[in-house]
């Protein structure tokens, strides 16, 4: 029997629980496909994708993809991506934890599609640095810039996020960064949100999306 060679690509597999096609004006420019990874370092109280914390075997829609198998699946919308300037948005979960997968996927795209990443930035620095050269649009959900509010809402320390945010602020292509600042029921106030936005503007961010979280309805 011929031995199967394990290439680097074969070793880069990622659990994905959603591939949502033909999205418009929600995840970046043009028509996009949203790809959502399993796994997240945060435990947000009003998480809208709570399945990202489950094991892949417990998520009916989830399966393991290689960069190439995902590429083949999403290529069916190639004409829409190219006609509208769209592409793929990686979310989750926390997509930066799958930076190697995204790097390999980007090589397969060969620059034809835009790559957008929606992230909390609460990750080690190398996860961000590895993707800075190839991501076309960053969408950052900061939760809140107040450390106490952040800790209560996410269950995590704010420090990693702030360090990564400083790194992004120093990035030469700041226009490619959208910062999402949520009103979080029971956790922050309008005053807190205004304070977060003021601090972000001081850092140099200009594309700021203020919105309101909705509490998930309990069954």
Question: What label would you give each PLM region?
Answer:
Residues 71, 75-87, 91-218:
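Conserved AdoMet/S-adenosylmethionine-binding subsite of the radical SAM
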């Amino acid at each position: 029997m011929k031995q199967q060679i394990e290439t680097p690509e074969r070793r880069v597999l990622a659990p994905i629980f959603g591939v949502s096609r033909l999205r418009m004006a929600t995840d970046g420019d043009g028509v996009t496909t949203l790809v959502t990874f399993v796994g997240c370092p945060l435990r947000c109280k009003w998480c809208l994708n709570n399945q990202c914390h489950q094991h892949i075997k417990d998520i009916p829609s989830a399966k393991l993809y290689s960069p190439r198998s995902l590429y083949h699946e999403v290529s069916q919308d190639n004409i829409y991506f190219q006609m509208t300037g769209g592409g793929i948005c990686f979310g989750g979960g926390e997509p930066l934890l799958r930076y190697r997968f995204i790097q390999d996927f980007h090589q397969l795209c060969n620059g034809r599609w835009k790559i957008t990443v929606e992230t909390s930035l609460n990750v080690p620095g190398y996860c961000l640095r590895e993707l800075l050269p190839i991501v076309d649009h960053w969408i950052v959900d900061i939760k809140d810039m107040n450390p106490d509010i952040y800790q209560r809402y996410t269950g995590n320390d704010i420090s990693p996020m702030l360090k990564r945010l400083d790194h992004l602020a120093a990035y030469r292509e700041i226009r490619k960064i959208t910062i999402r600042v949520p009103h979080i029921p029971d956790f922050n106030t309008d005053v807190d949100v205004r304070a977060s936005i003021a601090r972000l503007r001081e850092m140099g961010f200009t594309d700021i999306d203020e919105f309101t979280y909705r509490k998930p309805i309990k069954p």
